[in-house]
Structure formats: structure tokens, C-alpha cells
Amino acid sequence: MLLQGTHRIGRMAMLLALADENESPVLSIPKGWKYCTGKVGSMNSQKVVAAMETAAKSNRVIETDVYRETHALYHAIMEALYGVTRGQIQLADVLRTVGLRFAIVRGTPYDGKKEGEWVAVALYGTIGAPVKGSEHEAIGLGINHI
């Protein structure tokens, strides 16, 4: 059960999330892997989660009718949000808002087939008071098995 050096799922997700719209990260996505990217901004953490889940389903990164896939994605999203929010997934209640780019990557990072598929969610953007100029950069990464 070795993590393949060329199949670092979290690194790939982070590079995709960090890339600006006009730049393309130099990545070689392994054959059979799936990914999507997008943006979300809100004072409501439920909207942030829903936007990422919708993107993953509409881009066929996860199957819409398989509960364990949605469940794995949810936990990866929550882990990434913990990083962005420093462990407090409250936004509107404490007058915080986020503007994030996200990447969701699904693949097989281990050399053993028994380890199965994994999903990584990377978030990069800003968090702060809902006043322009009152935010700072933040980053989060969540990885979970499917």
C-alpha cells in the first residue's frame, strides 16, 4: 500500500484550486481520474457545500444515486472547510463571508487496487467580514476514501 508519487490526489486538487482562470496548472491527470473546478462565494456554509456537491454531480465526478460517494464527498468538503474557517464552520452567524475557488479530484492514489478510489477537495480564496478589503487568504484540503 504505497502512495504513488505521481498520483498525489491532494496535491493535484490544490494545484487546480490555486490556478487562476487564465493559467493552467501543469498537471498530468492520471488516466481514469475525474475532476472539476469552480467558484463559490457566500455567507452561508450550506450554500458553499451545495455548490461543490452540485458541481461534482453535474461533472460526473461522483454518481448522483450512490450514497457512499455523496457521503465521501461531503466529508472531504467539511474537512477542507475546517481549514478555511480554522475549525469553526460558522459564516453568517459571526459575520464572515468566503469567496473561494475549489477543485474536486477523484482517483486511485495508491498502487494497490484494494485501497480503492479517493476524493480530494481543495479550497482557496478569501474569508473575512462582509466588507470589501476586510478579508484575507485562506486555504483548505480534505481527502476521503469512497
UniProtKB/Swiss-Prot annotation:
Any one biological process term the GO annotation gives: L-histidine metabolic process
Origin: domain of life: Bacteria
Gene3D superfamilies, A to Z: Hut operon regulatory protein HutP (3.40.1510.10)
Keywords: Activator, Histidine metabolism, RNA-binding, Transcription, Transcription regulation
Pfam families the record matches: HutP (PF09021)
GO molecular function: mRNA binding
Chain's role: Antiterminator that binds to cis-acting regulatory sequences on the mRNA in the presence of histidine, thereby suppressing transcription termination and activating the hut operon for histidine utilization.
Subunit structure: Homohexamer.
Family: Belongs to the HutP family.
Protein's recorded name: Hut operon positive regulatory protein
Origin species: Bacillus mycoides (strain KBAB4) (Bacillus weihenstephanensis)
